[in-house]
């Protein structure tokens, strides 16, 4: 049976130590192209939208439906690490940087940031990591939706600009379609040259 994310952790923290409490997650660590997008979300306990869940198990139309409700009821910050930063700093450091930028972009400073995964960025607030946090914690699940929808929209736009690559479909992930486009048309400025599949396509590995 699928695990349902709850607001229990946040509610306990709010009762014991107070808030604000932000959930932080990212989208786009694995793709061969495009940015990493991180989001930080502070949910209003009195106005939590229905339907929030782990973005990886929601259908695209479900994510698109819940996205505006999160944006309308929560405090949201977004951070984007571009391909240059990914190639320069490596994917992990670029992801942590994007997370820190997302928290900085919040209009209020959180007391606690709940981070999906097992590594936390350096922040000016308390942090706590939570493995599979997007499946357990509503604030992180909301951040996962915001990050995923934001990144997907960027990749759809990129697909219109570069129609031979199919970015609007695979979102930069290593699908057979993407592999064929790389081998046929070569890498673009949006491809991550620090990733081995791109290096192979460029004859650098």
Residue ranges of model-derived segments:
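RNase H-like, Mg2+-dependent phosphodiesterase core
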Residues: 1-205
């Amino acid at each position: 049976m699928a695990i349902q994310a709850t607001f229990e952790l946040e509610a306990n923290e709010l009762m014991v130590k107070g808030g604000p409490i932000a959930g932080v997650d990212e989208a786009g660590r694995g793709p061969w192209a495009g940015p990493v997008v991180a989001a930080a979300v502070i949910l209003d306990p009195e106005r939590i939208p229905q339907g929030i869940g782990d973005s990886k198990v929601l259908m695209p139309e479900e994510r698109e439906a819940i996205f505006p409700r999160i944006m309308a009821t929560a405090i949201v910050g977004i951070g984007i690490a571009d391909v240059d930063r990914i190639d320069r700093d490596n994917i992990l450091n670029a992801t942590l940087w994007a997370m820190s930028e997302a928290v900085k972009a919040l209009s209020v400073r959180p007391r606690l940031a709940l981070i999906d995964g097992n590594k936390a960025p350096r922040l000016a607030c308390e942090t706590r990591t939570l493995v599979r946090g997007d499946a357990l914690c509503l604030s992180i699940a909301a951040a996962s939706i915001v990050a995923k929808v934001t990144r997907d929209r960027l990749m759809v736009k990129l697909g219109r600009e570069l129609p031979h690559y199919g970015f609007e479909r695979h979102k930069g992930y290593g699908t057979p379609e993407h592999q064929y486009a790389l081998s046929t048309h070569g890498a673009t400025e949006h491809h991550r040259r620090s990733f081995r599949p791109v290096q192979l396509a460029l004859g650098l590995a």
